[in-house]
Amino acid sequence: MACRLYLALIFSCVYLICLSSQQETGFVYNGFEQADLFIDGIAKILPDGLLQLTNTTELQMGHAFFKKPFDFDPSSSLSFYTHFVCALVPPKLGADGGHGIVFVVSPSIDLSHAYATQYLGVFSNLTNGTSSSHLLAIELDTVKTVEFNELEKPHVGIDLNSPISVESALPSYFSNALGKNISINLLSGEPIQVWVDYDGSFLNVTLAPIEIKKPNQPLISRAINLSEIFQEKMYVGFSSSTGNLLSNHYILGWSFSRRKEQLQSLNLSTLPRVPLPKEEKKKLSPLLIGLVILLVIPVVMVLGGVYWYRRKKYAEVKEWWEKEYGPHRFSYKSLYKATNGFRKDCRVGKGGFGEVYKGTLPGGRHIAVKRLSHDAEQGMKQFVAEVVTMGNLQHRNLVPLLGYCRRKCELLLVSEYMPNGSLDQYLFHEGNPSPSWYQRISILKDIASALSYLHTGTKQVVLHRDIKASNVMLDSEFNGRLGDFGMAKFHDRGTNLSATAAVGTIGYMAPELITMGTSMKTDVYAFGAFLLEVICGRRPVEPELPVGKQYLVKWVYECWKEACLFKTRDPRLGVEFLPEEVEMVLKLGLLCTNAMPESRPAMEQVVQYLNQDLPLPIFSPSTPGIGAFMPVSMEALSAIGVSSVRNSSVSMFVTHTILDGHGR
């Protein structure tokens, strides 16, 4: 028998310990669908889990309490911590509402004796100020009550046994970022967070909007000894009331604990949404309707004018000869939007025939848009025909021409954007890293392959006529892409190109260009000069150097003749290269710049030499045409009307490639 009593005593102790532990742990409700609450008055839990304390019914109150009391034994450490989210929604946003929400700690969940209106469903005339009430109320009051000595505006207050607050403040929160208090509109209908913390000495009340973390400083901090007010068992909950002024008062979520470290966080993202009042539709009076009509007519006229102006602004010229090129044509409006209206901050280059802009198409593709003017109809027709034909060229080492747009006196050319700019930026600009030997030889192979394709891999022979480092673009992987077809010419295989003005850049132009005209061999000559430019790290013509070094081809030849060919390499190459490979490429450059066109290799052979699929033919400094450099003078070019300058060419036609920050 004694054993049974002993076991029963043990079980009772365990039960009491568990119960005490449960009470100290507290609770958390992210919505109130499954909440264990005592509810009375007009309070109710809505289907979405929202706790509604009052609605827009006059002179009513509602209560919601946690059903189990908490142990607040004055002999032990007395503290509690709570965090809840509420919303006060008047019948019409921006209007007054009443009367407010109160967080209550009470010895009883029966507040039927309390009054509505300014008493907030907690107090009454009979119990105001009496110590026997044992009530703590944290009020969010939206109506001024003169008899309670309340503030002019909605306020937050601490009430002890009476609706007259012992401490109050206008609703606001401390901004950690700004270091000052920011006001809060209690009747905005927006969710508001409230923290009430009591550590045994100080009662702190803190507010913040739903999207703000708990501020570092409370709104109210009051030294209070709640052990003189609290009984051993106390209930926690909410109260709300209406009067002649009405509001929907909601609680979205609630967390409570006797201990700070055990207070569970609310999941703010999952809380139910607050229903806001719908705006009433007002009927328009006949007078107002008439005024609206009188206003609408001029507005319609203005909009019509704007529409006409925009149509004229985006109008594009189309002729019968452009129909066959339709798939390559962009609308002016799409390019206008892609470049943000051709804003200055989108401009990335400027050439002899127009400006270059970076743009982005709706799908995210980056493009380069060259904007130029024209007035010669026949010349523009020929240009469009040639450019669109080039749009059909497909090779991995060509800058893809995507299309064009013709509008009034403008032509816009669209190509793929090359993010790493042009090769000359890395060869001659000290601020950029110098390409390694591997990168240089790889780029040379890329451009040789592209030029071989233009000469032999297309339906018509394509002559580039302006090969140089500034026209070699680098994609995101630093692969070489041949661009700038502004000077390009086409002719059928088996026929010769009709005589045209000599074009190009000094130092890249073959000696026979003036007398014999353009051919595949003149492209080979330009490639040879470009090849030496890349390996030697200097431009083909530099007048500021001593006479013996001004012309790159001549200087490399003289160094070979003096058995010091190796010293012509770019000193920035470092040591990571094969000497025999450097020597082979330098000699190939001299072979391609042979003064005798028939002695120059075809681009197909150049590709084989660079890939070392074919040995370089044996020749020496005494071989006819090698090193016989005959520079085309500026005077001679001017005499035949060539548009060309040192270091950059002003093309007969416009470039369609883009130099990232530098234009032709």
Curated annotation (Swiss-Prot):
Question: Which reaction(s) are listed as its catalytic activity?
Answer: L-seryl-[protein] + ATP = O-phospho-L-seryl-[protein] + ADP + H(+); L-threonyl-[protein] + ATP = O-phospho-L-threonyl-[protein] + ADP + H(+)
Q: Where is the Protein kinase domain?
A: 342-619
The keyword Cell membrane belongs to this UniProt entry's keyword annotation: yes
Q: Which membrane topology term applies here?
A: Single-pass type I membrane protein
TM regions (residue ranges): 287-307
The residue range of the signal peptide is 1-21
The family database entries (CDD domains) matched by this protein are listed as: lectin_legume_LecRK_Arcelin_ConA, STKc_IRAK
MF GO annotations: ATP binding; carbohydrate binding; protein serine kinase activity; protein serine/threonine kinase activity; transmembrane receptor protein serine/threonine kinase activity
Checking Gene3D superfamilies in the record gives: 2.60.120.200, Phosphorylase Kinase, domain 1 (3.30.200.20), Transferase(Phosphotransferase) domain 1 (1.10.510.10)
InterPro entries according to UniProt: ConA-like_dom_sf, Kinase-like_dom_sf, L-type_Lectin-RKs, Legume_lectin_dom, Prot_kinase_dom, Protein_kinase_ATP_BS, Ser/Thr_kinase_AS
Q: Where is this region: Legume-lectin like?
A: 24-257
Q: What EC number(s) are associated with this protein in UniProt?
A: 2.7.11.1
Tell me, using the record's free text, what induces this protein. Answer: By salt and ethylene (ET).
| Keyword field | ATP-binding, Cell membrane, Glycoprotein, Kinase, Lectin, Membrane, Nucleotide-binding, Plant defense, Receptor, Serine/threonine-protein kinase, Signal, Transferase, Transmembrane, Transmembrane helix
Tissue specificity as recorded in UniProt: Mostly expressed in roots and flowers, and, to a lower extent, in leaves.
What does the record list as GO biological process?
cellular response to ethylene stimulus; cellular response to salt stress; defense response to fungus; protein autophosphorylation
- The residue spans the entry assigns to the Cytoplasmic side of the membrane are as follows 308-664
Identify its protein family: In the C-terminal section; belongs to the protein kinase superfamily. Ser/Thr protein kinase family.
Functional summary from the UniProt entry? Involved in resistance response to the pathogenic fungus Alternaria brassicicola.
The name this protein goes by in its record? L-type lectin-domain containing receptor kinase I.3
* Naturally occurring in which organism (per UniProt): Arabidopsis thaliana (Mouse-ear cress)
